[in-house]
Regions:
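Extreme N-terminal starter segment of soluble prokaryotic enzymes
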Residues: 4-11
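Conserved beta-strand and immediately adjacent loop positions that scaffold enzyme active sites
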Residues: 8, 102, 119, 152, ...
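Conserved hydrophobic/aromatic positions in well-ordered beta-strands
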Residues: 10, 121-123, 246, 267
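N-terminal phosphate-binding loop and adjacent alpha-helix
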Residues: 13-30
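Cys-nucleophile CN-hydrolase/nitrilase-fold catalytic domain and related Cys-dependent amidase chemistry
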Residues: 21, 33-125, 194-196, 200-210
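CN hydrolase (nitrilase-like) catalytic-core segments centered on the catalytic cysteine
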Residues: 81-102, 162, 171-267
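Active-site catalytic loop in hydrolytic enzyme cores
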Residues: 82, 86-88, 92, 108-186, ...
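Cysteine/selenocysteine-centered motifs that mediate thiol-based redox chemistry or coordinate metal-sulfur cofactors
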Residues: 155-183, 276-318
Length: 318
């Protein structure tokens, strides 16, 4: 469905109730109510908002046995079945508010416990529209999350337009982006944990490359958000995720809202989806400016199995 109208969107930068999925979902419902009151039809919430992102500031400790079993158990207990009752709560909020939402969760499989997934959900008044599992957990995330399969790389048709996107550093994967671009996203959701300047530059590039409005939303995680009985020792710092929510338009990659740092908050912007059509008149990465006929044949055959990170070179003792 190609929608050519103005859609009001909300980038909701928020702090989860860490290791409490039920309380985090209740908070998400309140935040969606705030977004609806502001007139938003679509809201985007952060990566693994329900209900813990394994930050590289402390996640390395999970490679030891000190506290790691307890953390893993509590993460699993505070993760989300998809579909499941917590998803149903969010869908009920979408239905009552007449909204769509993209939200990041830690997904579990209750019937087959043992692996969690970094998952992105598309929800709306009609229910669970789609889910995508992160293809490649980043560095420290591999202590917690399994890898995705890739058959869920899609843009979803809604009455807010076609909504595509990827999770955090998946957005750095050119072929993953291209796979979604081919489905014509008009709005690109990028839940993330990256609060760097380089990330925002990348979001601007994706807006230009895709011809879509980009909504990127990290968490804001102050030290005070962690429960007193958090199983791992936290390093001495006050903030573990500084935010940086941003909305970017598709013609020249201009930032139209944000970036928002150092606090919880919400960015609201009216996205004129006709701008994506105008942008693609000049550059359509998967249409008139694509040369699949030339470039696809230059790609080597993909390996049958995912590549592992090579081990470090062994140093012989002197």
């Amino acid at each position: 469905m190609t929608v050519l109208r103005t859609v009001r969107v909300a980038a909701i930068q928020a702090t989860p109730v860490i290791l409490d999925a039920e309380a985090t979902v209740r908070k998400a419902v309140r935040l969606l109510g705030d977004a609806a009151q502001a007139g938003a039809e679509l809201a985007v919430l952060p990566e693994t908002f329900v209900s813990l992102y394994p930050s590289n500031a402390w996640a390395h400790q999970a490679a030891t046995f000190s506290g790691s079993d307890e953390l893993w158990e509590r993460m699993w207990l505070s993760s989300v079945d998809v579909p499941g009752p917590l998803v149903d709560e969010l869908v009920a909020a979408c239905r009552s508010l007449g909204m769509h939402v993209v939200v990041g969760v830690n997904e579990r499989e209750s019937e087959r416990p043992g692996t969690l997934y970094n998952t992105m959900l598309w929800l709306g008044p009609d229910g669970l529209l789609h889910k995508h599992r992160k293809l490649m957990p980043t560095q420290h995330e591999r202590l917690f999350h399994g890898i995705g399969r890739g058959d869920d790389l899609r843009a979803v048709s809604t009455d807010c337009g076609r909504i595509g996107g990827l999770i955090c550093w998946e957005n750095r994967m050119p072929l993953a982006r291209y796979a979604v671009y081919r489905q014509g996203p008009q709005i690109w959701a990028a839940p993330t944990a990256d609060d760097s300047d380089g990330w925002i530059a990348h979001m601007r590039a994706i807006a230009i490359e895709s011809g879509a409005f980009v909504i990127s939303v990290p968490q804001y995680i102050p030290r005070t958000a962690f429960p007193a009985d958090f199983p791992l020792a936290l390093p001495e710092r006050d903030v573990f995720g500084n935010g940086g929510a941003v909305i970017v338009e598709p013609t020249w990659g201009q930032i139209v809202a944000g970036p928002l740092y150092g606090e919880e908050g919400m960015l609201v912007y009216d996205c004129d989806l006709r701008l994506g059509l105008h942008a693609k008149r000049l550059f359509d990465a998967v249409g008139h400016y694509s040369r699949d006929d030339v470039l696809a044949g230059l790609l080597p055959a993909a390996p049958a199995e995912p590549r592992d990170t090579p081990p470090p070179a062994r140093t012989e003792p002197a």
